[in-house]
Amino acid sequence: MPGLRRDRLLTLLLLGALLSADLYFHLWPQVQRQLRPRERPRGCPCTGRASSLARDSAAAASDPGTIVHNFSRTEPRTEPAGGSHSGSSSKLQALFAHPLYNVPEEPPLLGAEDSLLASQEALRYYRRKVARWNRRHKMYREQMNLTSLDPPLQLRLEASWVQFHLGINRHGLYSRSSPVVSKLLQDMRHFPTISADYSQDEKALLGACDCTQIVKPSGVHLKLVLRFSDFGKAMFKPMRQQRDEETPVDFFYFIDFQRHNAEIAAFHLDRILDFRRVPPTVGRIVNVTKEILEVTKNEILQSVFFVSPASNVCFFAKCPYMCKTEYAVCGNPHLLEGSLSAFLPSLNLAPRLSVPNPWIRSYTLAGKEEWEVNPLYCDTVKQIYPYNNSQRLLNVIDMAIFDFLIGNMDRHHYEMFTKFGDDGFLIHLDNARGFGRHSHDEISILSPLSQCCMIKKKTLLHLQLLAQADYRLSDVMRESLLEDQLSPVLTEPHLLALDRRLQTILRTVEGCIVAHGQQSVIVDGPVEQLAPDSGQANLTS
């Protein structure tokens, strides 16, 4: 009996010790955290940025007339040499605060004809899409005998991709003052994926060629459609080339690599130029096993995954884009960086017109197009519909200026929303063949400008502003790209090439003015009436 009592005592002591340890190490720290105000770790500016962004968003919501630029997700981590603005630590913020970037970009009240989508119709369409996805996902789980505790997807009206679609109007893909773009970039960067698949054009071409006849490394086209937990979609282009590598001089433009960092940088440049014609694009490090292989229902995509001799998980696309494993992309061992470009509204909701570029290049090894041999080619273009409308031609010239800055020779088509008619803006899609060679400036890309000798006054004013030291293009691009998770997105030679190419554009315009006169070359737009005191540079300087 005394032995049993001792055992009970030892048991009680042991239980008491365990209870005391639980109180001391688990419950008491939680009570302390509740009673003590939260302290922010030294050197962590996250809380300040979050409250600042919240205040900016609240200000924009309470006063629709107040223009608040929400382009910068974070403050730059470093201050580059020569990158400080007089009286300000940010050239990018100073640029967006300039009067040129604050002129009214649209009438105070947009009519239904000025918005791309009718909101109620779009929401009904998206609800049907979500319901259909839930049904198909349920059927797939039943067929594969899979169990899942995840609830069915719900369409959230406040989802950033929904608000992005509803915000597209005849002036651009998004407004300067819209806080939606920053939220969309953040969501694409962090939201988990729920499905992965080939793009529609790749599906249409699967098996449509004989892989033995492929004579080029066609894997450069590999891209996937990723869907996120909020039902948003993005085009994923994986890293194919290191940032410090240049396109070989013997490569034709139509077999060049598609670079994920070029897509990211093109979005930032388009925003800095105030075009707003490139869909929001962000960099992300993707786990190819968990975020692609394990969520895809496409058996063909599942079949092209393999483990390399270095134990890295790789995948490749089927013919005609890729036929061999040496053209695969590989994680390290699972992680792979790439670009994510937000999808535009479905063609069922917002039909788009794909138009051949009048300055399209010859996609043969030796041929040349008429514009390459005829310096008066633009005179012919001006007589042809729809380019006898100067606005369409001016938009093509804007596109050529953009392509020259990024070094993109592969602009064979452009797209437009049919709703906005002939005067609608051109969408600058597929920019992954830009930023290939920083050491070479392809002057032929500027042929629309040099042959037509026309430019929008608004475009010229922005270019001249970016040529000034306080707003130098390379500096604001460097600062803007620091916002991306994959920073540095561009190497320093590519950034400096932007300044060099900008000067080439301005010299081309100056030569046109000398030859034809300022009134003939510079086409006045609304910017002249809306911002007469916006600090324009001398047009002939």
UniProtKB/Swiss-Prot annotation:
Main location class: secreted
Post-translational modification remark: N-glycosylated.
Lineage: Eukaryota, Metazoa, Chordata, Craniata, Vertebrata
Region (Disordered): 38-90
Gene transcribed to yield this protein: FAM20A
Tissue: Highly expressed in lung and liver. Intermediate levels in thymus and ovary.
GO terms under biological process: biomineral tissue development; calcium ion homeostasis; enamel mineralization; positive regulation of protein phosphorylation; response to bacterium; tooth eruption
Protein name per Swiss-Prot or TrEMBL: Pseudokinase FAM20A
Signal sequence extent: 1-33
Matching PANTHER family: DENTIN MATRIX PROTEIN 4 PROTEIN FAM20, PSEUDOKINASE FAM20A
GO cellular component terms listed in the entry, alphabetical order: cytoplasm; endoplasmic reticulum; extracellular exosome; extracellular space; Golgi apparatus
The UniProt record lists the keyword Disulfide bond: yes
